[in-house]
Amino acid sequence: MSKLIAFDQEAREGLQKGVDALADAVKVTLGPRGRNVVLDKAFGGPTVTNDGVTIARDIDLEDPFENLGAQLVKSVAIKTNDIAGDGTTTATLLAQALVNEGLRTVAAGANPIAVNRGIAKGTERVVELLRELAQPVADNAAIANVATVSSRDEKIGAMVADAFDKVGKDGVVTVEESQSIEDESIVTEGVSFDKGYLSPYFVTDQETGHAELENPLILLVREKISSLPDFLPVLEKVANSGKPLLIVAEDIEGEPLQMLVLNAIRKSLKVAAVKSPYFGDRRSAFMDDLAIVTGGTVIDSELGHKLSETTLEQLGSARRVNITKEETVLVDGAGSAEAVEERRNQIRNDIERTDSSWDKEKFEERLAKLSGGVAVIRAGGATETEVNERKLRIEDAINAARAAGQEGVIAGGGSVLVQIADEIEELSRKEEGDEGIGLRSLARALRRPAYWIADNAGLDGAVVVSKIAEQPNGSGFNAATLEYGNLLEQGIIDPVKVTHSAVVNATSVARMVLTTETAVVDKPAAPAGQAGAHAGHAHAH
């Protein structure tokens, strides 16, 4: 395929326009008075959301050079979401601000490599300061505040805090759609483990990137699955049953994996496959745990089982399975409560008998997985659009609450970044040349989230930012009440993990854009009937 190439300023301008287009669509959602964005969908009704990463994922631009810029800043939102689960709008906005500030200085003659060094140096200092300012999450009220700020809904905040209170800060909290108008929360039996889907083709919800299976059959296999003739009979039996299928095995490779992916793409069978966690004896023991929880049998050739002769009766099941890129959660396995309790007692006996502290720790981990319930929050609403929008907000709240428990919290509303910006500005005065310019560019970018939170609230962002800079640490601007005060006391708080992930990911992409000299894209195909048209009109419409 023919390529289009842009150099120097032309390449950077194309990228900048794409960055601006995507970031401008996302930043209207920032803050408690931010607006919604409506996304048109090829199937079903439109999606109404204020979730930054959902909006970013939906945007592709017609101009190929501008689209490169949009995809770069989209990666900031997606990576921040993957690491912290929230803060995607802040990350997108920071990337835009830093790209614009940096390109302005480069156009004025600054050395982009030196500017980059300054930005990198400043980013390290920002992360240090964020961690120094972090306050530990002391109680359930703090979790509720974090979840409320993330979702903009006190009821969601309270439900999320209550869910974590019931299952513990390391417990599993998941979200699903409710059959009623009201939200509801339950704690149910469940097991989670740190393995995600083997192929992204198994994803059923493109917005969240999750594979969700309702009432699936569960095939547990001790060894690798690599022979299609052995695998096909059980796959056909499941297909005839009309139920979804989850496969947990040491690995699935070659033709069997290709067959599963093909079925998923054609939607002829709703299926997902994950590797079994751990190694050796631990893997084997955990597979036995799963068999008891799901009411299934582990297919094991050493015990005389043949995969090709597996019956539906040997498969386990669960009410629901949710799989992300990194984790699998089984809710309400079909195994009997008596069998599960018997297994727990067996593990408790193993803990008492062992002299090895390492073995004891691993037994306790297994016991925790079998004992810890899964909190399920069900998103309610009058319409499918409302339910989906609420589901996204609950997911953000859950992720923010979990992040807060990991690295602590800081005052929210972008206020801490404004105050840190002043310190970075001070640092820039000690640096000579273009590294100092890079530090100043970073300082200006750090003030933009607070600026846009104020702007979305109908106020002059520049005036609000200057007033925030005068506030003591922990204080700032509350866009919900339009007042200045102690944000920590008012419960306007952000998780440190979310803010620091946003800063690190935004600066990483901005630095790439600043040092770009050439952009290469596929030449757009001419629309039908215009094959001989001028290349300038060859963009796809």
Swiss-Prot record:
Location of the protein in the cell: Cytoplasm
Entry annotated with the keyword ATP-binding: yes
Enzyme Commission number(s) from the entry: 5.6.1.7
Stretch forming the signal peptide: none
GO molecular function, one term: unfolded protein binding
InterPro entries, A to Z: Chaperonin_Cpn60_CS, Cpn60/GroEL, Cpn60/GroEL/TCP-1, GroEL-like_apical_dom_sf, GROEL-like_equatorial_sf, TCP-1-like_intermed_sf
Cellular component aspect of the GO annotation: cytoplasm
Enzyme class, UniProt record, top EC level: isomerase
Positions with a binding annotation for ATP: T29, L30, G31, P32, D86, G87, T88, T89, T90, G413, N478, A479, A480, D494
GO biological process, one term: protein refolding
Record field: catalytic activity: ATP + H2O + a folded polypeptide = ADP + phosphate + an unfolded polypeptide
Superkingdom assignment: Bacteria
Keywords assigned by UniProt, alphabetized: ATP-binding, Chaperone, Cytoplasm, Isomerase, Nucleotide-binding
Function: Together with its co-chaperonin GroES, plays an essential role in assisting protein folding. The GroEL-GroES system forms a nano-cage that allows encapsulation of the non-native substrate proteins and provides a physical environment optimized to promote and accelerate protein folding.
Family of this protein: Belongs to the chaperonin (HSP60) family.
Quaternary structure annotation from Swiss-Prot or TrEMBL: Forms a cylinder of 14 subunits composed of two heptameric rings stacked back-to-back. Interacts with the co-chaperonin GroES.
Name of protein: Chaperonin GroEL 2
Organism: Corynebacterium jeikeium (strain K411)
